[in-house]
């Protein structure tokens, strides 16, 4: 059997062929549910608003090992820039091309095949295996994993370990696993002024001029030094808008959006307090609202990290590097329940880009890694 026809590749191609742009699922979870049901999983669809979710579980006892992931993908972008149609999975020179190949339908296929192999070899395994799958990870993340977790928490159903299939690898499969993520906090700020004619500035109040010293100081503030697990907290101004577009009108307001990626050395409350103190110090007339996108989390030494390190070394021959860099994932909704969370998936070089692709051999190796992790934890 060639790599192109490995079971993982075949399932990945089937999933990629379904144009499941957020929040659509397009039957991906039904396909996965059929495979899981055949090996003894209880399937529980959870539909919230426009989002399709699935909680699948095999076993009634703890510990509970959970594969977590998403069937939705980001939009394709300019289709004319793709080598092949993004929803017609194609293998070229050992790489599988298609939207979602790396983020994260390749991982989903590897999870399913690894679980099938594990259950066949170990039908009486310890504990339980679960799948938490959503179609709302790439979007507003309102009705996806967070709603499933709320449902599980309400009935006191706990996850012990969660392995998220996000594309964690950097240069080669398994060189990096994510054992934590920074917190994310967004501020939406409006600086108020008085609109007027640029020739009569004494009759107006320019909010851009008023805000400039504040923004300069905000961008230079030192928030913390980070620690051995997290880099220092960073703040980036993401959007600024003011004015009507005309050159002869002083704007009446300036809108600024900024985002913190913060370590465990500070809290969202501390960041908010410092920003609002700075606003008051500059005597600005403002409105501000805050969006909490997720708390920081960290999975330290223990069975999940040990099993993952062992699996990657056994399959690839090299050691992995646990890191907390990068963006957020749905792991941030699982970790607050007390679960230990790691992310392990394909190389992330092409995610969200045109011509997204994954190495075919990597998908088979990823499935082997997942299978060894299951053996280490549930045998």
Curated annotation (Swiss-Prot):
Residues where Zn(2+) 1 binds: 70, 103, 166
EC numbers, comma separated: 3.5.1.18
Co-factor binding details: Binds 2 Zn(2+) or Co(2+) ions per subunit.
GO MF annotations in UniProt: acetylornithine deacetylase activity; cobalt ion binding; succinyl-diaminopimelate desuccinylase activity; zinc ion binding
Pathway(s) served: Amino-acid biosynthesis; L-lysine biosynthesis via DAP pathway; LL-2,6-diaminopimelate from (S)-tetrahydrodipicolinate (succinylase route): step 3/3
Top class in the EC scheme: hydrolase
Keywords: Amino-acid biosynthesis, Cobalt, Diaminopimelate biosynthesis, Hydrolase, Lysine biosynthesis, Metal-binding, Zinc
Quaternary state and interactors: Homodimer.
PANTHER family linked: ACETYLORNITHINE DEACETYLASE (PTHR43808), N-ACETYL-L-CITRULLINE DEACETYLASE (PTHR43808:SF31)
Name of the protein: Succinyl-diaminopimelate desuccinylase
Encoding gene per record: dapE
């Amino acid at each position: 059997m060639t790599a192109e026809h490995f079971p993982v590749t075949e399932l990945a191609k089937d999933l990629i062929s379904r144009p499941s742009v957020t929040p659509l699922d397009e039957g991906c979870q039904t396909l996965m549910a059929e495979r899981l049901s055949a090996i003894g999983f209880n399937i529980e669809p959870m539909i919230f608003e426009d989002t399709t979710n699935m909680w699948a579980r095999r076993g009634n006892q703890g510990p509970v090992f959970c594969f977590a992931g998403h069937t939705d993908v980001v939009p394709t972008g300019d289709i004319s820039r793709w080598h092949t149609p993004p929803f017609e999975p194609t293998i070229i020179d050992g790489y599988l091309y298609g939207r979602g190949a790396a983020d994260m339908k390749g991982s989903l296929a590897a999870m399913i095949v690894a679980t099938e192999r594990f259950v066949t070899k170990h039908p009486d395994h310890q504990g339980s295996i679960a799948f938490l799958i959503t179609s709302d990870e790439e979007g507003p993340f309102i009705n996806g994993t967070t709603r499933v977790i709320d449902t599980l928490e309400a009935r006191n159903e706990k996850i012990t370990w969660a392995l998220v299939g996000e594309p964690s690898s950097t240069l080669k499969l398994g060189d990096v696993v994510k054992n934590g993520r920074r917190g994310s906090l967004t501020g939406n700020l409006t600086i108020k002024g008085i609109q007027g004619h640029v020739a009569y500035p004494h009759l107006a109040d320019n909010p851009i001029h008023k805000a400039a010293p504040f923004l300069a100081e905000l961008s230079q503030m030192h928030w913390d030094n980070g620690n051995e697990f997290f880099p220092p907290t960073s703040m980036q101004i993401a959007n600024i808008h003011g004015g009507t577009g005309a050159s002869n009108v002083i704007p009446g307001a300036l809108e600024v959006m900024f985002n913190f990626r913060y370590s465990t050395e500070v809290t969202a409350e501390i960041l908010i307090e410092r920003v609002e103190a700075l606003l008051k110090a500059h005597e600005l007339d403002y409105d501000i609202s805050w969006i909490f996108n997720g708390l920081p989390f960290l999975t330290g030494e223990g069975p999940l990290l040990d099993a993952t390190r062992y699996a990657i070394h056994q399959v690839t021959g090299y050691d992995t590097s646990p890191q907390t860099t990068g963006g957020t994932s749905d792991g941030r909704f699982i970790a607050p329940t007390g679960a230990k969370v790691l992310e392990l998936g394909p190389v992330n070089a092409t995610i969200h880009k045109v011509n997204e692709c994954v190495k075919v051999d990597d998908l088979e190796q990823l499935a082997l890694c997942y299978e060894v992790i299951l053996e280490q934890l549930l045998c």
